[in-house]
Design a protein with these regions (language model features):
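C-terminal catalytic lobe of FAD-dependent flavoproteins
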Residues: 258, 274-383, 387-394, 398, ...
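Iron-sulfur (Fe-S) cluster-binding segments and ferredoxin-like electron-carrier domains
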Residues: 275, 391-403, 423-440
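Flavin-dependent oxidoreductases
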Residues: 17, 177-182, 187-279, 287, ...
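Glycine-rich FAD pyrophosphate-binding loop
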Residues: 23-45
Length: 441
């Protein structure tokens, strides 16, 4: 049985950042992921928003880490060479009765320390974003809101963790966890591993993973949303647009992504088939998009996807609105129901837990830790993906870094993300995968 100081279960964006930040200390780390690649769970279907922090309860851990994570996102993305856009956001309402909700969020945000937050008149909002339907009653402007590609950020953290000495076991399913004299034994379908500490970052299955060792006080209830992706448009909003309905929560969201696409997300609803889309759901999203942005060209839709969100609840059915970090025994941490704004806070949560690990293990700082990771930049003159202009050299580098499937290449360099959705380049990429796939180097 191989021994580690820390075993991290789950290789989505959160698990990758926990592993990365543990290596800031002299802590040996193993990352376990059941899929053949990282960032294939919640991270693969995400709104890509770096939130400002006005929605969170003042004084909560979520409020603290969201504002800090937002402030640090630009420097983090610079370290990891991941594109980031601080485009700002407008939370708009057309209902005079809902303006009071915006005022409460403004007060909330000011208490949380959100910078430059202000309430705009309808005319100011419409001047700022001319594509908005006329008749805006008011809007909450948050210039610190941004957007970042979620799987690119997670994969970058994963690569940085590996280059700093973390180990990984992919396609490895955790079957059981046992308390031992010196920590924990984690049994998988491949082998057993020993860890002085365990960090449960299993996303949608986090409550079930904790149940392997301890009875969880928190359970997850899943809901879903459906998304539309529009091709790069000549005319699109400059900022992220949230629609504040009179009812609770937000309605439609329009996100101008760093890649140039426009992402439109629908309203959350009870989960059907995880990550699936429906004809009815797509029709609802399109109708809501036309209502908010009458001039948006929905003929530019190139794909759709479904997302899943884990909502944490106490055993008595009470909803939990802060980040839920269970610590049922020394050295065991479960992150159960880390949802929005989990992407914004992934690095901050990783640092928060790494400091706890360093204190628990008495670990010294890793003076050789390098926070910088180089993005894929290899190019040649042979274009394989015509839609996104991705070259053969870029694809080979993605494979060298661990992509073993078409999806893995897509999430690293963007192949198959354009109009043809891979119909013209998939066979060429499969041949390169056969030729160059030898695992992570």
């Amino acid at each position: 049985m191989k021994h580690f100081d820390a075993v991290v279960i789950g290789g989505d964006v959160l698990g990758c950042f926990v592993a990365r930040n543990l290596r800031r200390w002299n802590i040996s780390v193993l990352l376990l992921e059941k899929e053949e690649d990282v960032c294939k769970g919640i991270t693969r279907a995400n709104s890509a928003i770096c939130y400002a922090g006005y929605d969170n309860k003042p004084g909560s851990l979520k409020a603290e880490l969201t504002v800090r994570g937002n402030a640090n996102m630009a420097s983090l993305c610079e370290e990891l060479e991941v594109p980031f856009s601080r485009c700002g956001s407008l939370l708009v309402t057309y209902d005079e009765d809902a303006v009071s909700k915006l005022k409460r969020k403004l007060k909330n945000g000011m208490q949380n320390g959100v910078p430059e937050l202000r309430l705009l008149s309808g005319a100011e909002a419409e001047a700022m974003e001319p594509m908005l339907k006329k008749g805006v009653a008011a809007a909450l402007y948050a210039p610190s809101t941004g957007t970042v590609n979620p799987w690119q950020l997670g994969i970058a953290a994963f690569e940085n963790a590996l280059q700093n000495g973390a180990e990984v076991a992919l396609s490895t399913q955790v079957r059981a966890i046992r308390k031992t004299e010196n920590g924990y034994a984690v049994e998988t379908d491949k082998a057993a591993f020993a860890g002085k500490m365990v960090f449960n970052c299993a996303g949608l299955s986090a409550d079930k993973v904790q149940e392997m060792a301890f009875a969880p006080n928190v359970r997850l209830q899943l809901d879903g949303a459906e998304y539309l992706v529009l091709d790069s448009l000549a005319q699109k909003p400059s900022r992220i647009l949230f629609h504040q309905a009179q009812s609770c929560g937000k309605g439609i969201t329009a996100i101008p992504c760093v890649e140039g696409n426009l992402l439109i997300s629908g309203i959350r609803k009870p989960l059907g088939i995880p990550f699936a889309t429906t004809v009815e759901g797509m029709q609802e999203v399109q109708a809501a998009a036309r209502e908010l942005l009458p001039e948006v060209d929905l003929n530019q839709i190139i794909r759709s996807f479904g997302a899943v969100r884990p909502n944490p609840y106490l055993e008595n059915g009470e909803s939990i609105h802060d980040f839920c970090i269970e610590n049922p025994a020394p050295g065991f941490y479960s992150l159960i129901g880390i949802k929005t704004p989990g992407l914004t806070c992934a690095n901050e949560l990783g640092m928060y837990l790494a400091e706890k690990a360093a204190n628990y293990l008495g670990a010294e700082e890793n003076t050789s830790f390098d926070p910088k990771r180089k993005a894929i930049s290899e190019k040649d003159n042979e274009i394989i993906c015509q839609c996104e202009q991705i070259t053969r050299a870029e694809i080979i580098e993605a494979i060298r870094r661990g992509a073993t499937t078409l999806d893995g290449v897509k999430r690293r360099v963007g192949t198959g993300m354009g109009w043809c959705q891979g119909s013209r380049c998939a066979l060429k990429i499969e041949k390169l995968l056969e030729e160059y796939s030898h695992g992570i180097l």
